[in-house]
């Protein structure tokens, strides 16, 4: 299974992005639990999940910075 592409994360809207981040965090928790109980079979899933989480959080941060840098127009300035 190839690593997910960041373009896929950029296509998500804000709500879907938050849901995906939470899902990735839950998946990491599950993987850690399986590792602790010696039930983990696919160790490569750690890498894939961490990679996906990093991509999602990067996209989220890009959007935050973009929103901050966008000039806000107040009714007084119009």
Curated annotation (Swiss-Prot):
Gene Ontology molecular function terms on file: structural constituent of ribosome
Keyword Electron transport on entry: no
GO cellular component: cytosolic large ribosomal subunit
Protein family (similarity comment): Belongs to the universal ribosomal protein uL29 family.
Database matches in Pfam families: Ribosomal_L29 (PF00831)
Keyword terms: Ribonucleoprotein, Ribosomal protein
Name of this protein: Large ribosomal subunit protein uL29
Organism, as annotated: Rippkaea orientalis (strain PCC 8801 / RF-1) (Cyanothece sp. (strain PCC 8801))
GO biological process: translation
PROSITE patterns (alphabetical): RIBOSOMAL_L29 (PS00579)
This protein's encoding gene: rpmC
Keyword field contains Cytoplasm: no
């Amino acid at each position: 299974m190839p690593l997910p592409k960041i373009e896929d994360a950029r296509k998500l809207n804000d709500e879907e992005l938050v849901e995906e981040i939470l899902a990735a965090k839950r998946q990491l928790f599950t993987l850690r639990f399986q590792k602790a109980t010696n039930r983990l079979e696919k160790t490569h899933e750690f890498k894939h999940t961490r990679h996906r989480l990093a991509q999602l959080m990067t996209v989220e941060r890009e959007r935050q910075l973009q929103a901050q840098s966008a000039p806000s127009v107040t009714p007084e300035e119009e």
